[in-house]
UniProtKB/Swiss-Prot annotation:
Keywords: Endoplasmic reticulum, Heme, Iron, Membrane, Metal-binding, Microsome, Monooxygenase, Oxidoreductase. CDD domains: CYP6-like. It is a peripheral membrane protein. GO terms for cellular component: endoplasmic reticulum membrane. Its EC number is 1.14.-.-. The keyword Heme applies. It holds the Pfam family p450. InterPro entries: Cyt_P450, Cyt_P450_CS, Cyt_P450_E_grp-I, Cyt_P450_sf, Insect_CytP450_Detox. It comes from Drosophila melanogaster (Fruit fly). This is Cytochrome P450 9c1. Its cofactor is heme. GO terms for molecular function: heme binding; iron ion binding; monooxygenase activity; oxidoreductase activity, acting on paired donors, with incorporation or reduction of molecular oxygen. It comes from the Eukaryota.
Amino acid sequence: MVFVELSIFVAFIGLLLYKWSVYTFGYFSKRGVAHEKPIPLLGNIPWSVLMGKESYIKHSIDLHLRLKQHKVYGVFNLRDPLYYLSDPELIRQVGIKNFDTFTNHRKGITEGFNDTSVISKSLLSLRDRRWKQMRSTLTPTFTSLKIRQMFELIHFCNVEAVDFVQRQLDAGTSELELKDFFTRYTNDVIATAAFGIQVNSFKDPNNEFFSIGQRISEFTFWGGLKVMLYILMPKLMKALRVPVMDMNNVDYFKKLVFGAMKYRKEQSIVRPDMIHLLMEAQRQFKAEQEGSAESAAQQDKAEFNDDDLLAQCLLFFSAGFETVATCLSFTSYELMMNPEVQEKLLAEILAVKEQLGEKPLDYDTLMGMKYLNCVVSESLRKWPPAFIVDRMCGSDFQLKDEEGEVVVNLREDDLVHINVGALHHDPDNFPEPEQFRPERFDEEHKHEIRQFTYLPFGVGQRSCIGNRLALMEVKSLIFQLVLRYHLKPTDRTPADMMSSISGFRLLPRELFWCKLESRGPA
């Protein structure tokens, strides 16, 4: 009897769960939006992707190619209905023309259980007026002039990275796993350029700064489950006070940043890094606020306190630790697999070296290298670190095509996504997209690229604010590596990278193995 009652109870709970999971699945049919049939609980995410057997990136590209003729199509992310834009004109409207209606990212994941928590104060998480205030405060921090001041700090990290490679070669080890190598490099760059501390993750591979960075960026089962549950049940997750980030990691950075700020203020120390630039932005912000004659209510008055500053440092760390290393890994992979591109890049590097003579490489010379820029741009086309861009509709809105015809009627809080990776792999935008062709971005051909089909750093005012710094990190190390070493594939290097990627991460199963051969004295 107990077994029967238990079976009935389990069946009833299962039925409720099923009904709950499919409740939203009529959303796009009611609105006449093209979509593919979802499956309970997962929506349009295949089981094979969830189990790590296939790539979500490849799946999303294929889905785009099947539905792109509709300009807007629907995708169920678990049970959440998402509008995907495939038409450049609609992307322009959302990202540029009607930005005030599409200012914010989706709610939930980045806010955690406490809206006053540090992570909710980062530029990525802020919304509406508060975001605009912080963006305008931070924008002067990321100008070319300010980034140029960090070049020497990053160049020192380049030297440490190249010295490590040479030590490996001298010891008889010619093969290198690039993702780990580049992650250690980006860790050291962030440590010095953002937090003002010197670490060498090549000589001290288990240093605390690097270990915490790995814990923050690694994709664990529990971390993935938390993200999924925040998407499905954000209110419940907040009520249960489940933190998005490990608070021990947050406390580590809090002590690091606040300690550095206190010491610099007491000792009047000036160092051209992110903490200094943010402290300057904070001082400038407070001076403007004190001198302002605004009559707004005090509760609406903007602020930029130490927690706000810490939040931007944390964002800088979490955004730069993984994405720059990923870009470096894929750029090196493409140079390995396309030796003619590597040789052409080497020719430009040698020409620059000859032009410099005895002078060291500087920021302006590096950023002025045309073919290097083409190589990195093409790498970002094939392998954009941020594959998806999201926006939330702030009010009811009609999206219209170039002819003025209404394509879709959006409602307040509807979620709109732009599949950057799919746009970059669409043959209508980039012919033979699987081919690595840096010439797409040279002076002769770059005008052929349709506007709003190449978005490696996002679109509009909410595009990546730190893209100049990221590009400097990537280009400066690629310059030094190609100058000194010939990059070659090994037996462990995947010939078909897209087929080697699985799950939700932009990472091949075999990792990034590379053979390096010295070119002789640089």
